[in-house]
Amino acid sequence: MGKAENYELYSVELGSGPGGDMTAKMSKKKAGGGGGKKKEKLENMKKEMEINDHQLSVSELEQKYQTSATKGLKASLAAELLLRDGPNALRPPRGTPEYVKFARQLAGGLQCLMWVAAAICLIAFAIQASEGDLTTDDNLYLAVALIAVVVVTGCFGYYQEFKSTNIIASFKNLVPQQATVIRDGDKFQINADQLVVGDLVEMKGGDRVPADIRILSAQGCKVDNSSLTGESEPQTRSPECTHESPLETRNIAFFSTMCLEGTAQGLVVSTGDRTIIGRIASLASGVENEKTPIAIEIEHFVDIIAGLAILFGATFFVVAMCIGYTFLRAMVFFMAIVVAYVPEGLLATVTVCLSLTAKRLASKNCVVKNLEAVETLGSTSVICSDKTGTLTQNRMTVSHLWFDNHIHTADTTEDQSGQTFDQSSETWRALCRVLTLCNRAAFKSGQDAVPVPKRIVIGDASETALLKFSELTLGNAMGYRDRFPKVCEIPFNSINKFQLSIHTLEDPRDSRHLLVMKGAPERVLERCSSILIKGQELPLDEQWREAFQTAYLSLGGLGERVLGFCQLYLNEKDYPPGYAFDVEAMNFPSSGLCFAGLVSMIDPPRATVPDAVLKCRTAGIRVIMVTGDHPITAKAIAASVGIISEGSETVEDIAARLRMPVDQVNRKDARACVINGMQLKDMDPSELVEALRTHPEMVFARTSPQQKLVIVESCQRLGAIVAVTGDGVNDSPALKKADIGVAMGIAGSDAAKNAADMILLDDNFASIVTGVEQGRLIFDNLKKSIAYTLTKNIPELTPYLIYITVSVPLPLGCITILFIELCTDIFPSVSLAYEKAESDIMHLRPRNPKRDRLVNEPLAAYSYFQIGAIQSFAGFADYFTAMAQEGWFPLLCVGLRPQWEDHHLQDLQDSYGQEWTFGQRLYQQYTCYTVFFISIEMCQIADVLIRKTRRLSVFQQGFFRNKILVIAIVFQVCIGCFLCYCPGMPNIFNFMPIRFQWWLVPMPFGLLIFVYDEIRKLGVRCCPGSWWDQELYY
């Protein structure tokens, strides 16, 4: 969807500061006006942010919330607070009432035009009735039919939206189902939405934080704040107040973030919408929606149709007045012409075509909330994509290992058939032992039958990767750990940057202890004095330090997270069995260790992403990565998936290659650019726009979700149609601002899904590209359907024009037109939605919404004045043939209308002198209606065949590839036969049986249409860019 620029937004910008702490910045963005109430509300939000719970002592907290840090709240007080504050849940944005949704389906551009047409029919019926000139009820039937079409297609569109809403509602998983709470000294579990401020709660690894919580005690607690910052690095939570800002201190855990490991106990200080994330979620409501590109196209088309209808109607109203008709009669002509010009079947065609594409997308894991968003995807020229989980698998995986002075590629498949190193190596065994034992991650129980890569693990991303790799290589990592009981442990922290544990050995005859350590490679190496090479401990001299440094830089340059591992056997004399190891006193060595090797990990790209990015590139779509991750990692992933193409260099790459300072490099020489959040923060909007214009390949790293909004706005300033992916609550403003917001179905928050136009059920970037392809295809096919639908407007209109100007008996009635529009032609026009692409549409550039219109001048001119004109000649040839064979030669028909319609005249003579009563003349008139109807249908068969392609020959596309179209043509012919020859039709719908030869008259005209269009296409293919191409290619 396109989004309006008129909003005022108070934002909380979150990022990552030194030491992994969260930083916050409050700012107000303004684009256009904002109401006083909204401004006041935002100011109130700002005041509410000024909390001091993190700075209060435990006793002050107890007093403030009338609670106990050991026994929790009293149950009676908790019940009162629940009544006062309401449930602990994010209040969903105020939904649109169902009746409003349905009313919208009835009040679009085409719908309004059809309502007007129905009103005109009713007025015409009333005028005829008042004059006593009511020989048929055609206008009344037509009005009822038009209203029925609007209502039925409205119901269809509403049902599609309702069905998508139900799918989206099934994702309600942001709030945890259960929380462990202590009240009146008793510990029990309750639904998380029943928590109130002052509740004493407990969390453990694997739980979602159930509210904003002030930490009172913690043991190795780490949380994932990625829904706030976009960064997946775990954040430590502890009881100490480390910063005056509540958003930066470590003693506050935020609602809906994930507790990765460890345990914690704390007091609830905010619930529901009063939590930090609740306030951020409500800010997205400041961004308003506006029309989608397809809605603009349909409005443009309706303007053209309405303008032409009124022009033709007014012209012939004047002509009718000039040649002597009464005002009321001329007004009836005006209304009839307007109604004849309205393509009544087009609304159903557009709705069904979009619905079919939405259904097709749903089968490919894309749920479309708004039917019009289907086409918007096809117009997309820029995709701003997350990295984690969208471009990558959101599963940290061991990638490389360095031991015995060699870098090895890790095999993470179940069968281990691709392993490139000797698993019997003593060094490998030592490294594997260290990475298995020095690891706090654990598999959830009951997953023995689940493949290792898909098992759920309690622990942070890095330890999960190591545990799964150990499970794949050792076979039973948890059992292996049990053979080396842990007796002491120092958890990882950001100061030491290492994790250490001490274990007893599995051999009961060996009473030594094994000390193992992992952490930042440089920190681990500085604690080592030897290195393990081919099973032997060698002194860690300068040569081995250089080898380590080379390997470390090589792996780090790949954008991978690198960890170092070392070990030390503690002799039994100094550390006998039962020795009391003390982590506070550190009564064991932490230096003089033996370095075992390096292991690097990365969140690998999804297998389908490189091809998807390549498709985007060939389709002229720019893919921009926007991530909270480190610039090196972001750049490496961008290069591996093709966002940064092979051979492209950044300014830093050029400077390194030329060995010159970065500021001396001409930035325009760099095709690629990596901008981090700090740089983005210092750039003004014009600088960002210039960077986007200068560098075709862009990566934004260490960005906050709020900065994503700035990036989207800058792309839109360049005239791009922007699609944005997001999963966090703080992504919702960018999702709403984008022309089409794409939320993640698995990892996405409810706020993101509410703000988005489309949801990826598999969180896969390749699904977006599928959506783009389907969007482009439906635009092409809608163009074909509209061209097919518009063509018959001319043969439906010209009978009225000839009727008024030449005064022949009316060749075609309103009810007959209705059957063409809503019965026989609706199926062929819808069948074009199933047409395959003429060529690889993903090799074309995105359409320019200002230049490449759904209905352009060549389409209108070709449909109306060329193919439509041929159909009109066919209709009149058949009409005059039928009249002549019954005794009414063409010259006699001219000026015959007044006598023909005089129901008092019962002896009107034909060209042979035969006398006709009014009833006989009416029977012949209905026969002419049927003949003209059949003529249009025969020509429309040729028309639907030529509409299969706009450039290629139909022979190249294939006549029978689209089986739905073949069935539709057969159905069209069967309907025509049924209407002509079914008993009772003359009395019900004014259709008459006709002679066989009258079916044959329009066939040469149908052949002419086919040959004429093949010549047009040949010229378009042979002379690209010529006058012929510009004027005749639609």
From Swiss-Prot:
It catalyses: K(+)(out) + ATP + H2O + H(+)(in) = K(+)(in) + ADP + phosphate + 2 H(+)(out). Its EC number is 7.2.2.19. Residues 119-141, 319-330, 803-812, 877-928, 982-996 are lumenal. GO terms for molecular function: ATP binding; ATP hydrolysis activity; magnesium ion binding; P-type potassium:proton transporter activity; potassium ion binding. SMART domains: Cation_ATPase_N (SM00831). One of its GO terms (cellular component) is potassium:proton exchanging ATPase complex. The modification Phosphotyrosine is found at Y7, Y10. Pfam families: Cation_ATPase, Cation_ATPase_C, Cation_ATPase_N, E1-E2_ATPase, H-K_ATPase_N, Hydrolase. One of its GO terms (biological process) is potassium ion transmembrane transport. The chain crosses the membrane at residues 98-118, 142-162, 299-318, 331-348, 783-802, 813-833, 854-876, 929-948, 963-981, 997-1017. Its main location: membrane. It is found in: Apical cell membrane. Residues 26-39 have a biased composition (Basic residues). Keywords: ATP-binding, Cell membrane, Hydrogen ion transport, Ion transport, Magnesium, Membrane, Metal-binding, Nucleotide-binding, Phosphoprotein, Potassium, Potassium transport, Translocase, Transmembrane, Transmembrane helix, Transport. The keyword Chloroplast does not apply. The keyword Magnesium applies. SUPFAM superfamilies: Calcium ATPase, transduction domain A (SSF81653), Calcium ATPase, transmembrane domain M (SSF81665), HAD-like (SSF56784), Metal cation-transporting ATPase, ATP-binding domain N (SSF81660). Expressed in parietal cells (at protein level). Disruption phenotype: Mutant mice are born at the expected Mendelian rate. They develop achlorhydria, hypergastrinemia and ciliated metaplasia. The parietal cell viability or chief cell differentiation are normal when compared to wild-type littermates. Mutant parietal cells have abnormal morphology characterized by dilated canaliculi with few microvilli, spherical vesicles rather than normal tubulovesicles and enlarged mitochondria filled with concentric cristae. The active site is at D386 (4-aspartylphosphate intermediate). Mg(2+) binds at D386, T388, D727, D731. PANTHER family: POTASSIUM-TRANSPORTING ATPASE ALPHA CHAIN 1, SODIUM/POTASSIUM-TRANSPORTING ATPASE SUBUNIT ALPHA. The catalytic subunit of the gastric H(+)/K(+) ATPase pump which transports H(+) ions in exchange for K(+) ions across the apical membrane of parietal cells. Uses ATP as an energy source to pump H(+) ions to the gastric lumen while transporting K(+) ion from the lumen into the cell. Remarkably generates a million-fold proton gradient across the gastric parietal cell membrane, acidifying the gastric juice down to pH 1. This is Potassium-transporting ATPase alpha chain 1. It comes from Mus musculus.
